[in-house]
Curated annotation (Swiss-Prot):
Highest taxon listed in the record's lineage: Eukaryota
Domain IQ: 336-365
Protein name as it appears in the record: IQ motif and ubiquitin-like domain-containing protein
Function: Adapter protein that anchors the radial spoke 1 (RS1) complex to the A microtubule of outer doublet microtubules in axonemes. The triple radial spokes (RS1, RS2 and RS3) are required to modulate beating of the sperm flagellum. May play a role in inhibiting signaling via MAPK1/ERK2 and MAPK3/ERK1. Additionally, may play a role in the functioning of cilia. Not required for the functioning of tracheal or ependymal cilia.
Any one GO BP annotation for this protein: smoothened signaling pathway
Lineage summary: Eukaryota, Metazoa, Chordata, Craniata, Vertebrata
Subcellular location: Cytoplasm, Cytoskeleton, Flagellum axoneme; Cell projection, Cilium
Domain Ubiquitin-like: from-to ranges: 129-205
């Protein structure tokens, strides 16, 4: 809508139109009555009655107010602005002394009333703000004018009526803060003629959800427009702008001769009203039926019109029909049968063509899928080779060094095989000595890499340990949020961590290094013991050497000793109480007795986490370090592939979500025994022996995984196996017998595990097999010489 079209709108009409779109009873009636006290209400009522009597008494003077004011109710004019006490006194004095004044005084009194009314209305008009209401979560926006001093409860009741929601459930928020029923916009600092946004939502969204208001025109917008109603007189009118795509017809208008602006009639500016559809109307004769029971014959069959004297019948439209060949009913049905055959032939041809096209499309999609799968496998293989190459050249973890020693053993076996082909004994010995020297050099190189990796892991472990000690104490509240608290111990640990990080900094100037050493000295000086004395002596020695001009690279050993001693200082609970929670060795020896085991290989007492216990083992014998050392010196096996196989088993069982727990009891040695000794490290179907492509899936997918309910297959074979509805229909009898035999071997081996033994004993099949091959006589016990049996 243009400005010219807006100025043409008449103020009363536009005000009524806006009131029809959004009718809020509060700001015009109830809101103002609630703001007026009972005493003021009594005074205003007296004022209105007295003013009405005065106007009726002097009606012959024909004094009239402008149309815009007369169109409004009198009580609205009085209630929009709260009159001051001085004005009310003038009204009372004017009414009491009206009979004694002259006619000129009475006219001046009416003019004063008129001026006061204009001031009151102008003040009320200026206190309106534009409010944009956003319905959450519907996302509908409604723009409307609202008084800044009116309470929010009228706005809430209005939208509660539109949304059909109880007003006590509906909530309103301004700038993220819920507003009260008796609060207003002016209390939140909103000034007149400002544009604000408020959110409307439901406190019980499940029972009373907020939906879109269907009755409002889409794209409609209500704005406040100031129009001129007289000389130096303006009025604000709420105007609704309707965005419509209909063609506005030109229904006439006029053009301003001076400005040249065109003003169209109101019919071209508003959406035409839809004409209601009328129901189908029928005459009375069409709704009644007259029944006749006698037979009648039409008149056309009783007479024939022909040419005769006095009558001429034209034969221009007549046709000469010649009789065709006669065909019998059998010929007619045969012709229809031939037509049906032709139609069926065409349909079958079309249907076969569609079927072939669908098969061709399926074949194309299948070939594309197979191609993508092949590319995926190639990428996975390349990624595995790339990671294997990276592991060999940059070993970091224990698995990486196992892989290196395994490759070394394979290389040594190949070289030994070639050496054994030599004819003479001297050549074989010389070749074996040369091979031993090369092997020694490779082992030394691996040892250097391991030393570097240990230093890196030690630094990372130290930083992680300090971060854990200096972390704040956290709790999770019932609402999901986290509460953090710092104690004096965590603050102390954080201070020591910051000093440790400063000590590790390099490329510092001499003054900066002296400041760090001074801070460290003041921190350590708080406690007196042998450790702190050593740290202080080393600090003094470094300061002395720095003053003598010794270069930094010559002080690296001294600085490393200071760092190591300071780490011992940090890990002492006397100096850092927070560290006592994270030490492997607890301060109370009584808590440590049940978790200490003796290693028969290295003759050391170690905590339980340093031992790897298999489910089939009955006692703790050797620690992890001794087992790894034996593997490096003798077998040199790599367990990385078995670890990946075990990880794939864990992930596949987690997807079932049936609370299976036997798979998670399997250790690395168990899965290795199950793969090598029972399944021969190859697929049961295709005999594929690459462990990177094999998975251990359930034999019966409806029963949880166990060593006696599994099968070793490739990834593709495992996916196809799990899609089988019945194992008996999918495999042959001999293959099923072979798999069950392997399951019996697994049961015999894992029956040593107490947890698994209880599950195995419940199996009727294994009991039947054991009873079939059991013997009544006990086995013979062979007693060595020198031992007396009990």
């Amino acid at each position: 809508m243009s400005d010219t079209e807006e100025n043409v709108l008449d103020s009363p009409a536009s005000g009524e139109a806006a009131g029809e779109v959004i009718s809020i009873p509060g700001p015009t009636d109830e809101a103002e009555e609630s703001d007026i006290s009972p005493e003021q209400e009594y005074e205003i009522e007296g004022f209105t009655t007295e003013s009405e009597e005065t106007v009726e008494h002097y009606s012959d003077l024909s004094v009239s107010t402008p149309k815009s004011y007369d169109s409004k109710p009198r009580d609205e004019v009085v209630s929009l602005g709260s009159a001051t006490d001085s004005h009310e006194q003038e009204y009372r004095l004017g009414d009491l002394g009206g009979d004694q004044r002259s006619e000129e005084d009475e006219m001046s009194f009416l003019y004063k009333i008129k001026a006061i009314k204009e001031n009151l209305q102008s003040s009320v008009k200026e206190c309106i703000a534009t409010v944009k209401i956003v319905l959450i979560p519907a996302g509908q926006e409604i723009v409307m004018p609202f008084r800044v001093d009116a309470p929010f409860r009228f706005l809430k009741e209005h939208f509660a009526h539109l949304l059909r929601i109880p007003h006590h459930v509906l909530q309103m928020a301004y700038t993220g803060i819920s507003v009260g029923n008796n609060e207003s916009l002016i209390q939140y600092g909103v000034k007149p003629r400002e544009i604000v946004q408020m959110n409307v939502f439901s406190s019980e969204p499940d029972q009373y959800p907020v939906r879109r208001i269907e009755g409002l025109s889409e794209g409609s917008k209500i704005i406040t427009v100031t129009i001129q109603t007289g000389i130096e007189r303006y009025e604000e009118v709420a105007v609704e702008i309707v965005k419509s795509d209909f063609h506005k017809p030109f229904l006439g208008g006029f053009r301003h001769k001076i400005t040249g602006l065109e003003y169209h009639n109101a019919g071209t500016q508003t959406v035409p009203k839809k004409i209601p559809e009328k129901d189908n109307l029928f005459c009375r004769d069409t709704q009644t039926v007259f029944q006749k029971k006698k037979l009648q014959q039409t008149m056309n069959t009783t007479s024939t019109q022909m040419t005769k004297i006095g009558v001429y019948v034209s034969n221009m439209t007549d046709k000469l029909l010649t009789p065709g060949s006669y065909f019998s009913a059998a010929e007619y049905h045969a012709r229809r049968l031939n037509a049906v055959i032709v139609i069926q032939t065409a349909y079958r041809r079309w249907h076969a063509k569609c079927y072939v096209d669908s098969l061709r499309l399926q074949k194309k999609m299948r070939l594309e899928w197979e191609k993508e799968e092949e590319l995926k496998k190639i990428r996975e293989k390349e990624e595995w080779i790339r990671m294997d190459y990276y592991r060999r050249h940059n070993p970091k973890t224990t698995e990486d060094f196992e892989l290196l020693f395994n490759a070394l053993e394979l290389w040594r076996q190949e070289e030994v095989t070639q050496v054994e082909q030599y004819s003479s004994e001297a050549e074989r010995k010389a070749a074996l000595c040369e091979l031993l020297e090369k092997e020694t050099q490779i082992i030394a190189s691996i040892g250097r890499h391991r030393y570097v990796a240990q230093l890196e892991r030690q630094d990372v472990a130290t930083q992680a340990f300090l971060d854990k000690c200096s972390a704040s104490n956290t709790w999770r509240r019932p609402d999901g949020q986290t509460v953090e608290m710092d104690t004096q111990f965590t603050i102390r640990a954080r201070e020591l961590q910051s000093i440790y990080k400063c000590i590790l900094l390099k490329n510092l100037s001499q003054d900066e290094r002296l400041d760090i050493l001074l801070t460290l000295k003041h921190t350590v000086k708080e406690h007196e013991c042998k450790l702190t004395q050593e740290i202080l002596e080393l600090i003094d020695r470094e300061v002395d050497l720095m003053m003598r001009g010794v270069k930094s690279h010559n002080l690296e050993g001294l600085r490393k000793r200071i760092t190591t001693l300071f780490i011992h200082y940090i890990k002492t609970p006397l100096f850092n109480p927070e560290v006592a929670k994270h030490l492997k060795v607890p301060q109370d020896p009584l808590k440590f007795y049940d978790k200490i085991y003796f290693c028969h290989s290295c003759q050391m007492y170690l905590p339980s986490v340093e031992f790897s216990v298999s489910p089939t083992s009955h006692r703790v014998y050797r620690c992890r370090h001794c087992i790894n050392l034996e593997n490096e010196t003798q077998r040199r096996e790599s367990f990385l592939k078995y670890k990946c196989l075990l990880q794939r088993l864990y992930f596949s069982e987690a997807n079932y979500e049936d609370n299976s727990h036997i798979a998670y009891l399997m250790q690395l040695q168990d899965i290795k025994y199950l793969t090598e000794n029972i399944w021969a490290s190859q697929s049961a179907l295709s005999a594929w022996d690459d462990l990177n492509d094999l998975v251990m899936v359930r034999w019966n997918k409806h029963v949880e995984w166990s060593p006696w309910n599994c099968i070793l297959l490739t990834k593709d074979e495992g996916t196809a196996h799990l899609k089988l509805e019945s194992i008996e229909k999918g495999y042959g009898r001999l293959f099923i017998h072979k798999i069950k035999h392997k399951h019996i071997l697994a049961k015999n081996y894992f029956s040593q595990v107490p947890v698994l033994a209880s599950l195995i004993l419940k199996d009727d099949e294994i009991e039947a097999i054991r009873s079939k091959y059991s013997t009544e006589n006990p086995p013979k016990i062979i007693v060595p010489h020198g031992i007396v049996p009990n």
